């Protein structure tokens, strides 16, 4: 609603309260008579609403115009300098001008929201981040800061997610918690680009196929002790720069270790330069030698503590810095295999470090540093004192606590997928919890890049990685698969483990009885037998059969002679309902879609967050650098020593 102040007549001298009796000049008298200037009063009323000038832009009535206007001096008979008139007009108008500035963080009223929602504006507002959503919207009593919507594939601007009360509803319109992060699917690129990854020629690995201009030799590789006489046609940096201290002695041999192809230059090497020290023969000095080998690592991060865990990729131990008492988790990578070259080993280590150091999210472990000492690599990470497996097996988790941890896991997966990365080895052992009750994903040794920036194609992964109970079935039957669908499947298995405290099956093969019954559908008619259903699953090539024949497995679960056939038929259930009936009712729909056998039909992370139950989960999170705990539950943090042994399988 626009407010137009009343207009008054005033002269060019700016005295609106009284007029001078004596005119200063005839020129000013003509301006007073010929020019009609209107202006708001000296003390105009305070404007409560922004003024819309578009309604009066084309009107000819000067009295209705909110700003002073001047008529064109073309019709004045006597000559008047138009520049003088314009300058005096502007100085007079500026005297009564009061600028209105609205801070960008101000919250408009309901009427202004309705008005601005219908008006066309050319101003492009920045996208709403999660912190901005929490700061601008009131929170209901039973919800946390993550009331932002679930992301759908065609999610648009945030206008339709707001209700009349100014708060965000809890339906599918709400933007997800990971919408603030750049999605790899937004950087599509040109599908007709001739330099796309799928259109490139395969890399030539044979050295004889490489053009000569791309073949480089290390400095000093073929040099004798008499200098560069063997290759007179080749240029080197030493031949271009005069060196007055060039002596053909031991320094020439030392230059071989500083080639541009040496990958160890990327690491912070703390090796001792004193080569005259010989290893001690006495066994009593072995501990001292160990500390000497890790002198640089100890000096920077303290001394090694207890072992946290070990796996195929290496072992993780605690290091406590003596200067400030800060605790780190240091992963010692596995030793180089005999079949691996030093270059291949360094490339695998750097790949895991580069992926981990590029990720910064509340639900992702923070990778801090990597150190090389004595041809061993150590990755320094933040320390989280609790592991998810011990917390789950303690039996102290409530269902709201399970929901919170599951949504935190999905938030970390959503961030990974938005960066074009897939973990491929999600399991309870790769989830840790810090002192703020934040679930963090660790171990990116199996992570792959499925989408590169400005590339339109999805790079499929290959190879079977991960633990058997968490494996997606397509990894066993397909050479190439979408790694995003693998993360979704593993996340659903993790939820089943947290809710049921047991695995749904040992491995996703038809030879496993639990998984085979999960894959089977209820017979549509009496003529359709379970063998026919399994034969149909075999044709679809969605799961691996295993080593045991189908009939043998069916006979092992045939009703006993002492058991009633009708009671056995009632107990035997087929299909996903066999597992879903054990889960809470509100979780069954999304878990069923996450455990879809066909990876093409399986939910992606966007559709998972579009579920109403996922949106309504009250989750602990970080907001503006502050830890926000959910009021619906309290996390029971259990250390690994307090966790009981896993229950025996029935």
Curated annotation (Swiss-Prot):
Q: Residues annotated as region Disordered? A: 1-210, 222-288, 549-570
Q: Where does ATP bind?
A: 308-316, 331
Q: What is its main location?
A: cytoplasm
Coiled coil: which residue ranges?
none
- Bias (Polar residues) occurs at 1-14, 140-154
Q: Does the keyword Cell cycle apply?
A: yes
The UniProt entry annotates the active site at 425
Instruction: Give the UniProt subcellular location, in the record's own words.
Output: Cytoplasm
Q: Which terms in the Gene Ontology molecular function aspect does this entry carry?
A: ATP binding; protein serine kinase activity; protein serine/threonine kinase activity
Q: Which family, according to UniProt? A: Belongs to the protein kinase superfamily. Ser/Thr protein kinase family.
State what protein this is by name. Serine/threonine-protein kinase oca2
């Amino acid at each position: 609603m626009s407010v137009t102040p009343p207009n008054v007549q005033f002269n060019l001298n700016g005295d609106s309260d009284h007029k001078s009796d004596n005119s200063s000049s005839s020129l000013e008298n003509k301006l007073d008579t010929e020019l009609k200037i209107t202006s708001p009063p000296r003390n105009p009323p305070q404007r409560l609403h922004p003024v819309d000038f578009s309604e009066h832009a084309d009107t000819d009535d000067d009295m209705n115009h909110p700003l002073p206007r001047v008529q064109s001096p073309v019709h004045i008979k006597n000559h008047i300098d138009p520049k003088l008139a314009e300058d005096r007009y502007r100085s007079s108008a500026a005297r009564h001008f009061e600028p209105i500035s609205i801070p960008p963080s101000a919250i408009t009223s309901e009427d202004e929201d309705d008005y601005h929602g219908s008006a066309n504006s050319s101003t492009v507002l920045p996208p709403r981040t999660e912190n901005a959503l929490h700061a601008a919207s009131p929170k209901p009593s039973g919800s946390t800061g993550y009331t932002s919507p679930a992301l759908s594939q065609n999610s648009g601007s945030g206008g339709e997610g707001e209700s009349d009360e100014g708060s965000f509803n809890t339906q599918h319109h709400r933007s997800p918690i990971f919408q603030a992060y750049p999605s790899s699917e937004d950087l599509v690129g040109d599908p007709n680009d001739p330099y796309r990854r799928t259109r490139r020629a395969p890399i030539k690995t044979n050295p004889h196929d490489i053009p000569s201009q791309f073949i480089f030799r290390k400095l000093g590789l073929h040099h004798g002790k008499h200098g560069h006489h063997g290759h007179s046609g080749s240029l080197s940096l030493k031949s271009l720069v005069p060196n007055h201290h060039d002596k053909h002695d031991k320094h020439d041999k030392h230059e071989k270790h500083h080639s541009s192809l040496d990958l160890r230059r990327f690491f912070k090497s703390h090796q001792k330069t004193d080569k005259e020290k010989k290893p001690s023969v006495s066994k009593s000095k072995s501990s001292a030698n160990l500390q000497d080998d890790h002198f640089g690592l100890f000096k920077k991060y303290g001394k090694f503590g207890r072992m946290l865990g070990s796996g195929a990729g290496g072992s993780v131990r605690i290091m406590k810095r003596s200067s400030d008492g800060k605790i780190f988790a240091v992963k010692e990578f596995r030793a180089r295999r005999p079949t691996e070259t030093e270059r291949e080993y360094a490339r695998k280590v750097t790949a895991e470090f580069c992926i981990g150091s590029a990720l910064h999210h509340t639900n992702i472990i923070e990778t801090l540093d990597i150190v090389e000492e004595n041809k061993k690599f150590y990755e320094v990470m933040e320390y989280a004192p609790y592991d998810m497996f011990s917390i789950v097996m303690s039996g102290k988790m409530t269902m709201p606590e399970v929901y919170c941890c599951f949504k935190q896991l999905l938030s970390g997966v959503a961030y990974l997928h938005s960066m074009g990365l897939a973990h491929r080895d999600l399991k309870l052992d790769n989830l840790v919890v810090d002192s703020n009750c934040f679930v963090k994903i660790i171990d990116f040794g199996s992570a792959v890049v499925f989408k590169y920036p400005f590339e339109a194609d999805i790079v499929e992964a290959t190879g079977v990685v991960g633990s058997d109970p968490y494996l997606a079935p397509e990894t066993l039957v397909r050479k190439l698969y979408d790694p995003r669908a693998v993360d979704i499947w593993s996340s659903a298995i993790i939820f089943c483990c947290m809710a049921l405290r047991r695995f749904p099956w040992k491995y996703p093969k038809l030879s496993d009885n639990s998984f085979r019954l999960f894959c089977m559908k209820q017979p549509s008619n009496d003529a359709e037998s379970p063998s026919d259903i399994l034969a149909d699953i075999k044709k679809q090539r969605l799961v691996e059969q295993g080593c045991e024949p189908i009939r043998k497995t069916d006979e092992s679960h045939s009703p006993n002679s002492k058991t009633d056939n009708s009671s056995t038929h009632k107990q035997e259930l087929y299909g996903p309902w066999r597992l879903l009936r054990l889960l809470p009712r509100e979780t069954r729909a999304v878990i069923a879609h996450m455990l879809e056998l066909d990876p093409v039909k399986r939910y992606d992370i966007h559709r998972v967050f579009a579920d109403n139950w996922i949106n309504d989960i009250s989750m602990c999170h970080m907001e503006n650098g502050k830890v926000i705990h959910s009021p619906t539950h309290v996390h029971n943090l259990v250390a690994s020593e307090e966790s009981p042994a896993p229950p025996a399988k029935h």
